[in-house]
From Swiss-Prot:
Binding site for ADP-alpha-D-glucose: K15
GO BP terms: glycogen biosynthetic process
Domain of life according to the entry: Bacteria
Record field: catalytic activity: [(1->4)-alpha-D-glucosyl](n) + ADP-alpha-D-glucose = [(1->4)-alpha-D-glucosyl](n+1) + ADP + H(+)
Pathway the protein acts in: Glycan biosynthesis; glycogen biosynthesis
Organism expressing this protein natively: Lactococcus lactis subsp. lactis (strain IL1403)
Native organism taxonomy: Bacteria, Bacillati, Bacillota, Bacilli, Lactobacillales
EC number in record: 2.4.1.21
Keywords: Glycogen biosynthesis, Glycosyltransferase, Transferase
The protein's name in its UniProt record: Glycogen synthase
Length: 478
C-alpha cells in the first residue's frame, strides 16, 4: 500500500501546532509497518521557516507551471528522504516565501494553488498513492479536485482519500467566485449548495463531502462535532455522512518524551525508579523561586493562555485555589488580559504561584517532569497532547472531560481508588475548584493511592506505533 500524506505543516521542518506534530510522526511510523510499501509527505516549501540543516539536504526534482485563475504560476518540486519517508516540497516564492505559515489575506488562494499543484503533479512525481491522506481545510479541496477536475486522468481513478479534521473551527472560507476564478471550474457545485455554506465556498465542508473517509483526532471529538455545541455550523453535514466519520487519537513521540533519557531535563526516572521525579520537583521549585518543599503539591500548566484552553475559568477561581496548601507553575502566552491576571496573582501570592509568560520548550519539559499534577481545563479539545506527555512523566492530569481529554484520562474513582488523573464534566468554576481539591486531598491523605495512580498513568501506551496501526486498518477499509 502506498500512502501520500498532504499537509500544510510538518515537524521538524515547520509547524505551528498539533497538525505539524501529526504530519511529522504518523508517516514515520507508517513507514515501519509491513503493510505499507512506501510513504511520502507533500508540503508547501516555507523556506523562511525551515532550518538550514534541512534546506541544505533538499534536492531539486523538476519544475512546472500551474494555472491559478489568470495567474500562470511557477511550482518547483524539491525533496528529501528522512527515516523511511520521502518529503516533497512545492516551491513558489509568491505564495510561500513569507515570514510565517498563515495569517495572510490571501491564505485561501495560497492553498488553492497548493491543492491544484498537488493534483496536477502526482503523475510527474511518479508517486500515485493508493491512499491520499489530507488534513484540515488547507488540503481539503484535494478530494473534490480529484473527482471533479482531474477525473479524466486514468492513473488517479483508484486513489482513495481520507480527510483528518484537527480543529473544525478553521474551515477555509472564500467568496463563491473562487471556484471559477482560482480553481478554474464551473459554478454548478456552488449553486447546487454542495461546496457552499452560508453564502461562501467552504473548503472543509467540500472535503467532508468528497473524501472517502473523514476522521478526527479523537473518538469523542468525532461525536462532538456532530452537535451544535462543537460542530461550528457543519454538524448537519457531518450527521449526513456519519457512516464515514470516525476518530483516532493522536500519539506522542516516545523517542522525544521519555523520562528515562530526556535530554531537556537534568534528572531521569522510570516506573521502576521514581526518585528522579522528586529531584525534578526540587529543581522546578528552585528555578521558579518557590519554597523548596517536597510535601507541597505542585500543579503545572503549559498552554496557550486562551478561553478555548479554559484559562478564563481558571482565573475566575484562582484565588480560591491559592488559599489551599499548593504551589502552581504556569508557562505560556496568549490573551493579554489572561497574562495580566496571572501576573497579578503571582505578585499577590509569590510563594504559591510562578507565572512565566513565555514559550520555552526546555522549561515545559521540566514542568511536565517536576509537577505532581497538570491542569488542563480546556473548553474544548479535539485531542490534546499535553495530558499524554504529563502522564508519560508521572504527572496526573486534572482535566475537563471533553474531546481527547475524555478519551485519554481515566478520572479518579473514589470507590475503587483507581484512575490516571482527575476529571470534571460541567464546565463551571465551582466544579473546577472541587476537582482540584479532590486531587489535593488524595495527595495529602492517600499517598499510596496517588503513587498507584502515577504508575498507572506512566504505563499507558500513547505511542504513535499503536496509532499508526489504527490508521492502517482505516486505510484497509477503503
Amino acid at each position: 500500500m502506498k500512502v501520500l500524506f498532504a499537509s500544510s505543516e510538518c515537524a521538524p521542518f515547520f509547524k505551528t501546532g498539533g497538525l505539524g506534530d501529526v504530519a511529522g510522526a504518523l508517516p514515520k511510523e507508517l513507514a515501519k509497518k509491513s503493510e505499507i510499501d512506501s510513504v511520502a509527505v507533500i508540503l508547501p516549501y516555507f523556506k523562511n521557516e525551515m532550518k538550514e540543516e534541512y534546506r541544505s539536504l533538499l534536492k531539486d526534482e523538476f519544475y512546472d507551471f500551474v494555472d491559478v485563475g489568470w495567474r500562470h504560476e511557477y511550482v518547483g518540486v524539491k525533496s528529501l528522504e528522512k527515516e523511511g519517508v520521502k518529503y516533497y516540497f512545492l516551491d513558489n516564492e509568491h505564495y510561500f516565501g513569507r515570514g510565517q505559515l498563515y495569517g495572510y489575506g490571501d491564505d485561501g488562494e495560497r492553498f488553492a494553488f497548493f491543492d491544484l499543484a498537488l493534483c496536477q503533479l502526482l503523475e510527474k512525481l511518479d508517486f500515485i498513492p493508493d491512499v491520499l491522506h489530507v488534513n484540515d481545510w488547507q488540503t481539503a479541496m484535494v478530494p473534490f479536485l480529484l473527482k471533479e477536475k482531474y477525473n479524466w486522468i486514468k492513473a488517479y481513478e483508484k486513489i482513495k482519500t481520507v480527510l483528518t479534521i484537527h480543529n473544525i473551527e478553521f474551515q477555509g472560507l472564500m467568496h463563491g467566485d473562487a471556484l471559477s476564478e482560482l480553481f478554474g471550474m464551473g459554478m454548478e457545485r456552488y449553486f447546487e449548495g454542495v461546496v457552499r455554506h452560508n453564502g461562501m465556498l467552504n473548503m472543509l465542508k467540500t472535503g467532508i463531502l468528497y473524501a472517502d473517509r473523514v476522521n478526527t483526532v479523537s473518538p469523542t471529538y468525532a461525536k462532538e462535532i456532530q452537535t451544535s455545541e462543537f460542530g461550528c455550523g457543519l454538524e448537519s453535514i457531518l450527521q449526513y455522512v456519519d457512516g464515514k466519520v470516525s476518530g483516532i487519537l493522536n500519539g506522542i513521540d516516545y523517542d522525544i518524551y521519555n523520562p528515562e533519557n530526556d535530554i531537556l531535563i537534568p534528572y531521569h526516572f522510570s516506573e521502576e525508579e521514581l526518585s528522579g521525579k522528586g529531584q525534578m520537583k526540587a529543581e522546578l521549585q528552585k528555578r521558579t523561586g518557590l519554597p523548596l518543599n517536597p510535601n507541597v503539591p505542585l500543579i503545572g500548566m503549559v498552554s496557550r493562555l486562551t478561553n478555548q484552553k479554559g484559562f478564563d475559568l481558571v482565573l475566575s477561581q484562582l484565588e480560591k485555589v491559592l488559599e489551599e496548601n499548593v504551589q502552581i507553575v504556569l508557562l505560556g502566552t496568549g490573551f493579554p488580559e489572561i497574562e495580566e491576571g496571572f501576573r497579578y496573582f503571582s505578585q499577590k501570592y509569590p510563594d504559591k504561584l510562578s507565572a512565566n509568560i513565555a514559550f520555552d520548550i526546555q522549561f515545559a519539559q521540566e514542568i511536565y517532569a517536576g509537577s505532581d499534577f497538570f491542569l488542563m481545563p480546556s473548553a474544548f479539545e479535539p485531542c490534546g497532547l499535553s495530558q499524554m506527555i504529563a502522564m508519560r512523566y508521572g504527572t496526573l492530569p486534572i482535566v475537563h472531560e471533553i474531546g481527547g481529554l475524555k478519551d485519554t484520562v481515566i478520572p479518579f474513582n473514589p470507590i475503587s481508588k483507581e484512575g490516571t488523573g482527575f476529571g470534571f464534566v460541567d464546565f463551571e468554576g465551582q466544579i473546577l475548584v472541587e476537582t482540584i481539591n479532590r486531587a489535593l486531598e488524595v495527595y495529602g491523605k492517600e499517598p499510596e493511592v496517588l503513587n498507584k495512580m502515577v504508575l498507572s498513568a506512566m504505563s499507558k501506551d500513547f505511542s504513535w506505533g499503536t496509532k499508526a496501526q489504527q490508521y492502517i486498518e482505516l486505510y484497509q477499509e477503503l
